[in-house]
Structure formats: C-alpha cells, structure tokens
C-alpha cells in the first residue's frame, strides 16, 4: 500500500496556481543552521519523496522546515501517507530514525483547530518523553493554531483541570494521569478520533496494559489506533488482534542496532570501574555523554564520584521529585552540562542530538534494555559510541545480547578512531527549541564556542580558579539561580535518600544539599 501511495505522491506537488509561486513562501522561512554531519542508511535509504509530496498544509510544511527537517526518513515515508488515510498502523523502526515525526506530522495535518475538542491522544511511558513529544508537536505545528497539552503523574491535578477548561486539541501524557482525567470526566475523549502509543512495547507491558484497555473505552469505536516502537513482543500482537482493525504493518528492522553506533566492551573488575571511567573521560572526545547504572542508588553514588573527580555531572532517576527531573532533562538537552548519569528512566525515546557517547557503567540484563540504551547516541543516522564496562558476572549477558541482537561488541582498542564518533563542526548540532520565555534560559546556553562544545574533558582542577569552562565544574556554583536540591549545591549534606556534594573549581561556600525524600514515588 505504501509503495502505491509513494508512486502517486511523487507526482504530487502543492500549487497555488501561479508559476513559481509554490516555492515563493520558502524564501521567508526562518531556517536553522544546516546539520552537515554524516548520516547512515538508517535514514538516507529512502524512496526519494519530499514533504511537499504528501499534500500537507502549507502552515504545517513551514513548521517542518523551520524545525530543521529536509526530507522524510524511511519510517516517515512509510507511515505518513497511510496515517493520513485514517488506517490503523503497527510501525516498527530503529531508535532514532524519526518515529515521533512519523506520527506527529499526520496528526497535525488531520486536526481541525476550529473544533474545540480533544482530537488526538498520544501516550508515552515516561514523563521526560511526554515533555519531549509535546514540544515536537508545538514546534512542528506552531503556525497551525493547535493547542497541545502535556500531563503526567507526579504533579497535582488542579493545573490540568484548569488547562482543560480551554480548548485542547492534542493531549500528550502518561497512561495513569490520562486515565485519572478521563475517569473524572475532565478530559472528554468521546470524540477523539486518534489514539497513538509511542514506545508501544513498554506501554503494553503488564504494568500498563490494564490502564490502556480502560482508556480505549473512552474513545469512539471508529478511532484510529497507531502503535510505534523499536521492538514488538507478543503483547503487541495480542493488543492488535483485539483492538485494531486491519492494521497496516511497517517493519523497517532489517537489523536491530543503528549502523552509526560502534560498540565496545572493556573487561574490568568492579572496584576498577570508576578508574576506567576516569580514563575514558580523559581520552575520549566527548560532546555529551549518558552513563547508565542499574539502580537509583548507584546513579547517585556514581554522580558523586564523577563530581569528586572534577567533571561536570547531572543525575536523574525515577525517585527524584518531578520538578528536579524536569530541570535536569531541560538543562542537559540544552547543553548546560556534559555528562548525565541515569537509570533506565531515560532509555525510552529521549532524543538529544549532541550525545555522541553512551557508557553502560552497569551492563544491562537483557537485549531490549541494551538496545534502547545505546540508541541514545547515533541519533537520526549520525555517529556515536557505546562503551560497556563488563565484569566477570556480565560475561554471559554479553554473549546473550550479542546473539539476540545479531551484533558484535568488540574489545575496546587502545585508541579509538575519532572518525567513528567525533563531529567536525559541533556548533551545527541542532539544539531543541526551548519553551522557556526569553531571559529564563540557562545562563550558559548559546555561549559555547566550537572548541568548548567538543573537547577532551579535563578535571576542574586544571581550570583557572573562579572561571570554570562551560560544561566543567560543579554546575550549581556556576548557576546559583537554581536552588534545586538535585543540583549539587556546594557543601555536603544529607536529606531523604540523596546527598549534596561540593564540586571543585566552583564558587560554592558550604551550605547543604538535599536529595529526594524517601516517600517520593516514580
């Protein structure tokens, strides 16, 4: 079906009736800097379609091009024309190949802003992914007059109830919170024709499936259901058979791992892992890195160790308060800090273009988790590294993951070729469009030179006293306006489950840092 539509669409062009006028509007677009990084066939192996071939609204095309999109990726070519027809879709594609835009673009095209009803529900498994997806909707649809609302657990219902008193066309959120709003008759889904699940394999796991089934009861029977994911377990087929009508199946997983990611392992004893990580920091040319641990406790302990070594570091996990998680996510995406230590909270769908190195400080237990972790680098066909610190107990997991994914994880060489992961022009890496008002952006954002954007990391002790470089030093001392307890606050203290630790090279003068309370829920 998609091939037939593609053939028809290749000959389709928008026109307002006058020669040459169809391209005149492009000259007035506020286009971002061109991203000239090398891309792999994961996103370049297309049928040659253009976004104009889909007969989209001009205002939507303007948002697409101003967001930096040039041509549709393979998953977008396959899904957009089918989604526009209203047919149910089961789409499977690799991490970081443009799945979000593959369902957001047809959604924005089909929504009528004159109808003050919820017309699309987008479900995601985590709060961070909900924020990211809602921002994509707002960015691509900024010329359409469409209202987008994001709602997740961990916050009060009052603000959501007030927000829903005004027209909302798209709701992006986590299942539990949406069910609360629908069950209280605050969110009216009775005329919502589109039901979308991103990271569908996670949403159809045991913990979410009952909620998903209940949510579907609030939708009309003739709704369009679209599922997108990188992996489709049997639970997805069961859901499809029960709740979808002749879904169009898209499978672009000729292989599971992204071609741009080079994978290595280093065999180290547990007690030598921090030393090994320090060596990697000193030798790799890191733009931004994400370091994964297998527990929230180890996340905090490792973040403390990295700070003590003198490197800038954020941490995030599910037991942190929501406002702290939001701030960490926002600031890391905008390049305020170079390294992020986290649990598997951020393995799902998170798109940070500047991340070129992922380190599994703790090796994952299964292939699915490994696949999603390493997919945080090498986004959208670009290059990246995945480095795994392996101890004796991990050796069988390493073998099993290689077998299950059909990939090879090589021993780390003494020297890693920079061409495998280093960007020649890091200043051209796209940064997300912030939704903070002007003047409220982090102080360091937008002030990095290309040399600061990408360099070998050096401990803070080597920096001139009082003048830490961007991405270096204890970030709280560089950004004193952030009084958040999860940003190491100068000095040392205890509170709940967390700690605050004094960084080196900063300007903090004592005080106490506090971690998340013991009773905070994920």
Swiss-Prot record:
InterPro entries registered for this protein in UniProt: DEAD/DEAH_box_helicase_dom, Helicase_ATP-bd, Helicase_C-like, P-loop_NTPase, RNA-helicase_DEAD-box_CS, RNA_helicase_DEAD_Q_motif
Major localization listed first in the record, in broad terms: cytoplasm
EC number, as in UniProt: 3.6.4.13
CDD domains reported in the protein's UniProt record: DEADc_DDX6, SF2_C_DEAD
Domain called Helicase ATP-binding: residue spans: 80-250
Record keyword RNA-binding present: yes
GO biological process terms held by the UniProt record: mRNA processing; mRNA transport; regulation of translation
GO CC term, one of those recorded: P-body
Segments forming domain Helicase C-terminal: 260-420
Gene3D superfamilies: P-loop containing nucleotide triphosphate hydrolases
Residue positions binding ATP: 93-100
Residue ranges with Basic and acidic residues bias: 1-10
Region: Disordered, residue numbers: 1-44, 431-522
Similarity comment: family membership: Belongs to the DEAD box helicase family. DDX6/DHH1 subfamily.
Domain observations: The Q motif is unique to and characteristic of the DEAD box family of RNA helicases and controls ATP binding and hydrolysis.
Role, per record: ATP-dependent RNA helicase involved in mRNA turnover, and more specifically in mRNA decapping. Is involved in G1/S DNA-damage checkpoint recovery, probably through the regulation of the translational status of a subset of mRNAs. May also have a role in translation and mRNA nuclear export.
Name of the protein in its database record: ATP-dependent RNA helicase DHH1
Species this protein is from: Gibberella zeae (strain ATCC MYA-4620 / CBS 123657 / FGSC 9075 / NRRL 31084 / PH-1) (Wheat head blight fungus)
Gene: DHH1
């Amino acid at each position: 079906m998609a091939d037939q539509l593609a053939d028809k669409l290749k000959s389709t062009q928008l026109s307002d009736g006058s020669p040459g006028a169809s391209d005149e509007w492009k000259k007035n677009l506020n286009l971002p800097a061109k991203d000239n990084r090398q891309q792999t066939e994961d996103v370049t192996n297309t049928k040659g379609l253009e976004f104009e071939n889909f007969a989209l609204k001009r205002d939507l095309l303007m948002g697409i091009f101003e967001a930096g999109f040039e041509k549709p990726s393979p998953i977008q070519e396959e899904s957009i024309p089918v989604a526009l027809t209203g047919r149910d879709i089961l789409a499977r594609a690799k991490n970081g190949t443009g799945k979000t835009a593959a369902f957001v673009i047809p959604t924005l095209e089909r929504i009528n802003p004159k109808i003050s009803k919820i017309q699309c529900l987008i479900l995601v498994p985590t709060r961070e992914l909900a924020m990211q997806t809602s921002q994509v909707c707002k960015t691509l649809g900024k010329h359409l007059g469409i209202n987008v609302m994001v709602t997740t657990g961990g916050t009060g219902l009052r603000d959501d109830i007030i927000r829903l008193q005004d027209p909302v066309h798209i709701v992006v959120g986590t299942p539990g919170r949406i069910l609360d709003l629908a069950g209280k008759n605050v969110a009216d889904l009775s005329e919502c024709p589109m039901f979308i699940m991103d990271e569908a394999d996670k949403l159809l796991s045991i913990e979410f499936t009952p909620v998903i089934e209940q949510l579907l009861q609030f939708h009309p029977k003739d709704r369009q259901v679209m599922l997108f994911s990188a992996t489709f377990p049997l639970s997805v087929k069961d859901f499809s058979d029960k709740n979808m009508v002749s879904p169009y199946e898209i499978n672009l997983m000729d292989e599971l791992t992204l071609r741009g990611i080079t994978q290595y392992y280093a065999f180290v004893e547990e007690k030598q892992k921090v030393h090994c990580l320090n060596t990697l920091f000193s030798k790799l040319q890191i733009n931004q890195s994400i370091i994964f641990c297998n527990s929230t406790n180890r996340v905090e302990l490792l973040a403390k160790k990295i700070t003590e070594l003198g490197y800038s570091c954020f941490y995030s996990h599910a037991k942190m308060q929501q406002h702290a998680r939001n701030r960490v996510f926002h600031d890391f995406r905008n390049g305020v800090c170079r390294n992020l230590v986290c649990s598997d909270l951020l393995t799902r769908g998170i798109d940070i273009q500047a991340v070129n190195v992922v380190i599994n400080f703790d090796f994952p237990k299964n292939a699915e988790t490994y696949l999603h972790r390493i997919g945080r680098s090498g986004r959208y066909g670009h290059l990246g590294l995945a480095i795994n610190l392996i101890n004796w107990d991990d050796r069988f997991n390493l073998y099993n993951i290689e077998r299950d994914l059909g990939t090879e994880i090589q021993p780390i060489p003494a020297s890693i070729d920079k061409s495998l992961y280093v960007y020649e022009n890091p200043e051209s890496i796209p940064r997300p469009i912030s939704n903070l008002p002007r003047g409220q952006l982090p102080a360091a954002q937008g002030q990095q030179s290309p040399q600061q954007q990408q360099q070998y990391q050096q401990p803070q002790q080597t920096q001139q006293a009082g003048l830490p470089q961007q991405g270096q030093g204890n970030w709280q001392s560089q950004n004193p306006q952030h009084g958040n307890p999860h940003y190491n606050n100068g000095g040392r203290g205890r509170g709940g489950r967390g700690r605050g630790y004094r960084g080196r090279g900063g300007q903090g003068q004592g005080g106490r840092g506090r971690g998340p309370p013991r009773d905070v829920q994920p």
